[in-house]
C-alpha cells in the first residue's frame, strides 16, 4: 500500500511507503517477556542475590569423547549456581517478585501457597523479609530439611495429602479464613518473570552462550529463563532437562514437546528429584512450546552420578533436582543433539554450554545414602 504525502520542492508528488504492520505479539508476551523480566530484576535487586557462575576444567574434559578430540571440538560448561541464592534455591526470585507487587491490604493479609519444597521456603522467607504472614500447605513426604527451613522463616505449616486436589482445597480453605493471596509455585506471571532473572544474569555474565540447560517440572523457571535468553540472544539453544523417574515412563515435558500439545495425564514420576514432580501449567506450556528447543530425559542413576561429579569436582552440594541439568549435559542424548542438530551443531568448534544448578537443599542423610558404596 502506498500513501500520498504532500509535494516535493520540484512540485512532484511525493510518496511515502506505509509502515509494515507490526507483527502480533506472542500470547506469552503479557506475562513472560524480556521487558517484564527486566522490570522484575530491578524490583528484586535490593533483596535477591546475583548468583555466581562457576567453571570446572575437569568436568569440561569429561564432556569431550575421543571423536570430539579428533574433530578438535571442545565443550566448556558454565554453571549458574542458584545454590547460593537466599533460601538455597532459585525460588526466592519469583516469590520476592510476587510479594513486591501486592497492595498494602494484600500484604497485611499475607500470602499462601502449596509446595513440597523450595517454593514453600522461598515464599516464607520473602514474606519474612517484608514482615507479613505466610501460610504454607505442605503435602506428606516433603523433605525434612525443607520443612525445617519453612519453620525457620516463620511460615505457618498446614499438612495435607500428596495430591493436587487436596493441596488446592487446603489452600482455598486458608484463603477463605485469612484473606491471604495465593502465590502459585510456577503457573503465575510474577513467579515466571522472577525466575527469568536467572537467564538475564546468565547472559550478562556469559554473553556468548551457545546453549542453556535448565531443569523442568512445572515450567516456571525454564519459561522465564527461555523468555530472557531468547529475547537477548535468539540463536542460543534452550534445553529442558527432565527426570524419567524410577518407573522409566516418559515424562510430561518430553511427551508434550513430542506431541506439540500439553500432556498432563501421565503419572507423577517416582524420582529422587523431589522438586521436579509437578506438571506444566497453562501459562508455562506455551513458553516451553515456543521457546524451548528440546527436552532431554535423565535416569535416576544419571542424576546421582551428576551429584557426585559436582560434589567431587566442584566441591558444591546440590540437591537431586539441582543436578538434573548436568545429568542431561553428560547424557548420550545431548551428544546426539550436539552432533545432529544444525542450529546448535554449526555454532562453532568451541561450544559454551550453560547449566543451571537450581538448588542445594538436600538432607545430609539422603546425601550419605546416595553416595554410599553399592
Where are each of the predicted segments found?
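PLP-dependent amino-acid enzyme catalytic core
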Residues: 2-374
Amino acid at each position: 500500500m502506498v500513501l500520498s504525502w504532500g509535494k516535493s520542492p520540484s512540485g512532484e508528488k511525493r510518496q511515502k511507503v506505509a509502515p509494515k504492520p507490526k507483527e502480533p505479539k506472542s500470547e506469552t508476551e503479557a506475562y513472560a517477556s524480556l521487558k517484564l523480566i527486566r522490570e522484575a530484576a530491578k524490583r528484586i535487586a535490593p533483596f535477591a542475590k546475583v548468583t555466581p557462575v562457576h567453571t570446572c576444567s575437569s568436568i569440561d574434559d569429561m564432556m569431550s569423547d575421543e571423536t570430539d578430540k579428533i574433530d578438535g571440538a571442545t565443550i566448556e560448561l558454565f554453571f549458574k549456581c542458584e545454590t547460593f541464592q537466599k533460601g538455597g534455591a532459585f525460588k526466592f526470585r519469583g516469590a520476592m517478585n510476587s510479594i513486591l507487587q501486592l497492595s498494602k491490604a494484600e500484604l497485611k493479609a499475607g500470602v499462601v501457597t502449596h509446595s513440597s519444597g523450595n517454593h514453600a521456603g522461598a515464599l516464607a522467607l520473602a514474606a519474612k523479609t517484608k514482615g507479613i504472614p505466610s501460610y504454607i500447605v505442605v503435602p506428606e513426604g516433603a523433605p525434612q530439611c525443607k520443612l525445617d527451613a519453612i519453620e525457620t522463616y516463620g511460615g505457618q505449616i498446614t499438612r495435607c495429602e500428596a495430591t493436587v486436589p487436596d493441596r488446592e482445597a487446603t489452600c482455598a480453605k486458608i484463603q477463605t479464613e485469612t484473606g491471604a493471596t495465593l502465590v502459585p509455585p510456577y503457573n503465575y506471571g510474577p513467579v515466571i518473570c522472577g525466575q527469568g532473572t536467572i537467564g538475564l544474569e546468565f547472559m550478562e555474565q556469559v554473553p556468548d552462550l551457545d546453549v542453556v540447560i535448565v531443569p523442568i517440572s512445572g515450567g516456571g523457571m525454564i519459561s522465564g529463563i527461555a523468555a530472557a535468553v531468547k529475547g537477548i540472544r535468539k540463536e542460543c539453544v534452550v534445553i529442558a532437562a527432565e527426570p524419567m523417574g524410577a518407573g522409566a515412563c516418559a515424562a510430561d515435558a518430553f511427551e508434550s514437546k513430542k506431541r506439540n500439545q500439553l500432556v498432563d495425564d501421565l503419572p507423577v514420576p517416582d524420582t529422587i528429584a523431589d522438586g521436579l514432580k509437578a506438571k506444566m501449567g497453562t501459562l508455562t506450556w506455551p513458553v516451553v512450546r515456543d521457546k524451548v528447543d528440546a527436552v532431554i530425559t535423565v535416569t535416576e542413576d544419571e542424576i546421582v552420578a551428576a551429584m557426585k561429579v559436582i560434589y567431587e569436582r566442584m566441591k558444591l552440594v546440590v540437591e537431586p533436582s539441582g543436578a538434573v541439568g548436568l545429568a542431561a549435559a553428560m547424557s548420550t542424548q545431548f551428544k546426539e543433539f550436539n552432533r545432529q542438530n544444525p542450529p546448535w551443531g554449526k555454532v562453532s568448534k568451541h561450544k559454551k554450554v550453560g547449566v543451571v544448578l537450581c538448588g542445594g537443599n538436600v538432607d545430609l542423610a539422603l546425601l550419605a545414602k546416595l553416595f554410599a558404596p553399592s
